[in-house]
A protein has these predicted regions:
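Conserved S-adenosyl-L-methionine
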Residues: 26-86
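Short helix/strand-bridging catalytic loops that position acidic/His residues to coordinate divalent metals
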Residues: 198-209
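A short acidic (Asp/Glu
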Residues: 46-48, 65, 176-177, 194-199, ...
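Active-site flanking residues adjacent to catalytic metal/cofactor-binding acidic residues
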Residues: 35, 56, 168, 186-188, ...
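Short, glycine/acidic-enriched loop or turn micro-motifs at the edges of active sites
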Residues: 39, 60, 172, 190, ...
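Long, positively charged, glycine-interspersed low-complexity recognition regions
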Residues: 209-285
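SAM-dependent nucleic-acid methyltransferase catalytic core
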Residues: 2-19, 25, 29, 74-185, ...
Length: 285
């Protein structure tokens, strides 16, 4: 029987919902403790069975939303969302109401309000300026807190109870929570793409060769301590190859698995079929 996956209510760019079936077939069959090092909207975390979950992301605004979700009942959260939408007259068409609510959020920084704001924003992006004010434009005629997002939110809320959330740069993460045989999943920004979340212009540190090399060094060290890992990445994009990734997995004799997917709603999609994006999953087991 085909497993039914839960889609995160975040609609995070680069999320793994549509390829969960592909990457999970290479995950360990039994997981005691799992760390999702770049969890984003938590699609992988909420869809992977483990005794204990740790979910981390540098974007503390997103982590604050999840920890806020953990504090309250599903009924309370839905009532808050519905009441706020009504109070501020938020809709697919009222750009002025959106801007007023965005200004209000930027003055209060209430996590649940940020979630609502994201629901009505362009492409559902979490985009911030250097002052960490939310600055994503209005998603006119496209974005809203619709019935599908409501259903996804309800399903997600049921899966958050045993997840420990943190917001740290990956270099500063406490890997001491992992013991031999445990599992780490890493879905970092992709070095050779130009996605909006790794350009260093969203209020958070960008991604460069330095971060790429540091991450691989950490994964190699975890491997030496008997910890299993799976790394999502792109090895080729529009004719550009990630030579750092290729050398690292070959030198360490890790396993490279091809993933068949195109990100049609972001900068990954290439019209020239000769220059498609080649996404992979690297495992050490």
């Amino acid at each position: 029987m085909k497993k039914e996956y839960i889609k995160s209510p975040m609609n995070y760019i680069g999320n793994k919902y549509r390829i969960m079936g592909q990457i999970q077939k290479w995950f360990p069959r039994k997981i005691d403790t799992m760390v999702d090092l770049f969890c984003g909207g938590c699609d992988v975390t909420i869809n992977t069975d483990a005794q204990t979950h740790y979910a981390n992301d540098i974007n503390y605004h997103v982590i604050d939303i999840f920890t806020e979700f953990q504090k309250y009942s599903t009924d309370y959260i839905l009532e808050y969302i519905d009441g706020t939408i009504k109070k501020w007259h938020l809709s697919k068409t009222d750009a002025e109401a959106y801007k007023m609510f965005r200004d209000y959020y930027n003055s209060t920084k209430e996590p649940l309000d940020l979630y609502i704001l994201m629901c009505f924003s362009f492409n559902y992006q979490f985009r911030f300026n250097s002052n960490h004010d939310y600055n994503n434009p209005f998603g006119k005629d496209r974005s809203s807190f619709n019935d599908v997002m409501r259903a996804n939110l309800i399903k997600t809320l049921d899966r958050l109870s045993n997840i420990h959330f943190t917001s740290k740069e990956f270099q500063n993460y406490d890997f001491g929570v992992l013991k031999q045989g445990d599992f780490l999943y890493a879905d970092p920004p992709y070095l050779i793409t130009c996605a909006s979340y790794n350009d260093g212009k969203r209020g958070f540190t960008g991604w460069s060769e330095r971060e790429e090399i540091n991450l691989y060094s950490i994964l190699t060290d975890l491997d030496k301590h008997g910890i299993k890992f799976a790394l999502s990445n792109v090895i080729e994009h529009k004719g550009v190859k990630n030579d750092i990734l290729a050398k690292w997995y070959r030198d360490n004799k890790y396993h490279l698995h091809r993933v068949n997917f195109n990100y049609n709603n972001s900068n990954y999609h290439a019209k020239n079929t000769d220059k498609v994006t080649k996404e992979v999953l690297v495992t050490n087991y």
